[in-house]
């Protein structure tokens, strides 16, 4: 059975369905992932649907999944466009984003009038179609998944150059255009208030949370350990800022400096740095002990996490990572796995005592903490239980549902639905013809 909002949460959106039975309409814009592959966006879609909204999504097509141009999944209407990911530096991003904006406006015209346009970054360019829809009566909810200026500094190592100033300007324009801002954690909320100039009452924290029904442990499979006593697991994106290189160097130190070879490691996921990380593993002499799976089905992911003894969160401290909530940390916690992390502000907020923390970017200490947990099964069990309790309690999606619906209620307060009247007029014109 699908868990929906409780009665108090439903009350926050009392006018989601009009007296004439016409639902308010929301249009969610995404550029960097397909839907429902983007789990946060999909949870938002189904929460709004359960609260009576008619939900549309515009997003790119996936390469291996989410490939249909049009789909209706569990009552959510998804409109997808072809998009080639950027290559070749800034010019590649200009081509990608220009194409995405053109397709987004094209499909938004097809969707028609909406009450809320909900734009998810990156990039901080979706305020452009959002402004176009605002002029047609929509309210604009900005869902800030990433701090793009910090992402730029962390990913490209170019300093505060002209492009950095440009992304800062785009962020400011997005904040100004939005009626309501959704932040993924308190650090992002502080940025929206301090740097974005938003009033605190207009910024709502909607934490990402794993789908509990997707992360149900299964019996461990010792064969996944490739004959070793311990399995170490990394799950997530492999981009330049995600720290897979730190994890690999820590594993080399675990072997070379601590003399530990009683482990097998699996890295699940893909990204821009995937090939470089496979090559780094080879150069470090880890090919026999480290396995890269790429993206795998959920069922296989759960098998690895259920068998893992220690999970790795090697995101280095940088301007973005220190204030970002890492989905992999939450997913490890949902599966009851102990975590080794670098000491980042939001990592501690999320994991608490479900993780042990190495000083920022200290690979030797990261390796030592892996060894410590491998040698202490009782501590691993305690940490795993703490993580599961946090995910089912203060970090649960049910709490985020309430905040999301409160944000939509605030966006629509004193704002008459535009879509019902407009659609009625469209129907009358169709009948007259």
List where the protein language model places each region.
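N-terminal subdomain of nucleotide-sugar transferases
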Residues: 2-77, 208, 423-433
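Conserved donor-binding/catalytic core segment of Leloir-type glycosyltransferases
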Residues: 27, 182, 224-251, 266
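Nucleotide-sugar-dependent
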Residues: 38, 242, 299-304, 313-334, ...
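Carbohydrate-associated surface elements
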Residues: 187, 208-209
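Conserved acidic donor-binding segment of nucleotide-sugar-dependent glycosyltransferases
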Residues: 355-364, 372-378
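A short, well-ordered alpha-helix in the C-terminal region of glycosyltransferases
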Residues: 372, 379-394, 406
């Amino acid at each position: 059975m699908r868990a929906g909002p409780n009665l108090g949460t439903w009350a926050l959106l009392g006018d989601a369905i009009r007296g004439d039975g016409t639902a308010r309409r929301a249009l969610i814009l995404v550029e960097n992932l397909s839907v429902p592959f983007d789990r946060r966006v999909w949870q938002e879609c189904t929460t709004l649907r359960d609260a009576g909204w008619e939900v549309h999504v515009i997003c790119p097509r996936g390469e291996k999944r989410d490939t249909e141009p049009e789909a209706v999944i569990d009552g959510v209407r998804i409109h997808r466009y072809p998009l080639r990911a950027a290559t070749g530096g800034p010019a590649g991003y200009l081509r990608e984003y220009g194409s995405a904006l053109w397709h987004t406006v094209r499909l938004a015209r097809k969707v028609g009038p909406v009450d809320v346009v909900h734009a998810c970054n990156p990039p901080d360019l979706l305020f452009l179609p959002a402004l176009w829809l605002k002029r047609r009566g929509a309210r604009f909810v900005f869902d800030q998944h990433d701090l793009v200026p910090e992402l730029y500094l962390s990913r490209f190592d170019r300093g505060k150059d002209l492009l950095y100033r440009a992304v800062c300007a785009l962020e400011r324009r997005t904040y100004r255009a939005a009626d309501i801002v959704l932040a993924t954690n308190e650090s992002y909320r502080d940025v929206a208030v301090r740097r974005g100039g938003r009033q605190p009452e207009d910024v709502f924290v909607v934490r990402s949370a794993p789908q509990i029904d997707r992360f149900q442990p299964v019996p461990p499979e010792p064969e996944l350990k490739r004959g070793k006593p311990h399995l170490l697991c990394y799950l997530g994106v492999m981009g330049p800022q995600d720290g897979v290189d730190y994890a690999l160097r820590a594993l080399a130190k675990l072997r070379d400096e601590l003399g530990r070879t009683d482990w097998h490691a699996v890295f699940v996921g893909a990204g821009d740095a995937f090939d470089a990380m496979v090559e780094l593993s080879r150069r470090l002499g880890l090919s026999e002990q480290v396995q890269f799976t790429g993206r795998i089905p959920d069922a296989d992911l759960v098998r690895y996490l259920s068998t893992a003894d220690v999970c790795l969160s090697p995101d280095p401290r940088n301007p973005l990572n220190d204030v970002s909530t890492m989905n992999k940390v939450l997913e490890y916690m949902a599966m009851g796995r102990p975590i080794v992390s670098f000491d980042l502000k939001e990592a501690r907020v999320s994991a608490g005592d479900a993780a042990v923390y190495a000083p920022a970017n200290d690979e030797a200490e990261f390796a030592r903490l892996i060894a410590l947990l491998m040698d202490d099964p009782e501590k691993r069990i305690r940490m795993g239980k703490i993580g599961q309790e946090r995910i089912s309690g203060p970090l649960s999606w049910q709490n985020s549902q309430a905040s999301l619906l409160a944000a939509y209620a605030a966006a629509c307060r004193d704002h008459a639905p535009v879509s019902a009247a407009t659609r009625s007029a469209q129907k009358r014109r169709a009948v007259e013809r």
